[in-house]
Amino acid sequence: MFKSGFVAILGRPNVGKSTFLNHVMGQKIAIMSDKAQTTRNKIMGIYTTETEQIVFIDTPGIHKPKTALGDFMVESAYSTLREVETVLFMVPADEKRGKGDDMIIERLKAAKIPVILVINKIDKVHPDQLLEQIDDFRSQMDFKEVVPISALEGNNVPTLIKLLTDNLEEGFQYFPEDQITDHPERFLVSEMIREKVLHFTQQEVPHSVAVVVESMKRDEETDKVHIRATIMVERDSQKGIIIGKQGAMLKKIGKMARRDIELMLGDKVYLETWVKVKKNWRDKKLDLADFGYNEKEY
């Protein structure tokens, strides 16, 4: 008998949702950074064994939006509640429950689907603090289970996976066993470039960046994959920061992104990057759609 199911990973920004998904999948399919709102699109991670398939849906961190892009991200996250049988509500062990958590809990109660509370980053707190956190969240909602983990170190992650597989129902294998995500390579390439921008830049730059892969094709003579990508920003000052002195920052971003892209593709890559200014793109629906943030996603 084959069992399968869809599982959403929900929570505030920076609680470790993408770190968890990457650990489960054994490779990077969701980009990570210490900047809030790193994940902007829903991303499937397809975990398949001989007898089970769990389709995880990593979601943007739920926050109070200030732009049309923020609206898209929050609606994209909540839309998964219509698509899954189980929700992993992830919270950090080293932060107390806040208004953002309470807002999510109210939506989860209304959805009327099983919710597992996943308390991440247990490596950062004393066990007594963890117990207080568990009691506090349990006082707000009747969770199906509570599972403390460390997504970064992998602590207790196998326990959570076993809990999910034990509760799967008989179902189809929705995706081939060798498919690990629903997004095309172009999307993953654009995300890997954006991840390096987030890593190397500060202040207002990360939130204002989008990456568009203009072309991606193999050069038969060199046997390299040629990729042309444009980094979009909202202001000239941001463009200057990303390019850097004599182009040094852009070269660093390209070099580090190329390493990850080559690892993913299993091919040598020639990466060309440009930086363009598109003023206030985060509040323009046409620009959002052009840059891959389309309302059709939810």
From Swiss-Prot:
- UniProt domain KH type-2: residue ranges: 201-279
Localization in the cell: Cytoplasm; Cell membrane
Q: Name one Pfam family in it.
A: MMR_HSR1
Q: What is this protein called?
A: GTPase Era
Show the segment(s) annotated as G5: 149-151
- Please give the InterPro entries that the UniProt record associates with this protein: G_ERA_dom (IPR030388), GTP-bd (IPR006073), GTPase_Era-like (IPR005662), KH_dom-like_a/b (IPR015946), KH_dom_type_2 (IPR004044), KH_sf_prok-type (IPR009019), P-loop_NTPase (IPR027417), Small_GTP-bd (IPR005225)
Q: Which Gene3D superfamilies match?
A: 3.30.300.20, P-loop containing nucleotide triphosphate hydrolases
Chain positions covered by the region annotation G2: 37-41
The molecular function terms of the Gene Ontology recorded here are: GTP binding; GTPase activity; ribosomal small subunit binding; small ribosomal subunit rRNA binding
Q: What does this protein do?
A: An essential GTPase that binds both GDP and GTP, with rapid nucleotide exchange. Plays a role in 16S rRNA processing and 30S ribosomal subunit biogenesis and possibly also in cell cycle regulation and energy metabolism.
Query: Major location, coarse class?
Result: cytoplasm
Which PANTHER family does this entry report, sorted A to Z? GTPASE ERA (PTHR42698), GTPASE ERA, MITOCHONDRIAL (PTHR42698:SF1)
The Swiss-Prot or TrEMBL record describes its family as follows: Belongs to the TRAFAC class TrmE-Era-EngA-EngB-Septin-like GTPase superfamily. Era GTPase family.
- Show the segment(s) annotated as G1: 11-18
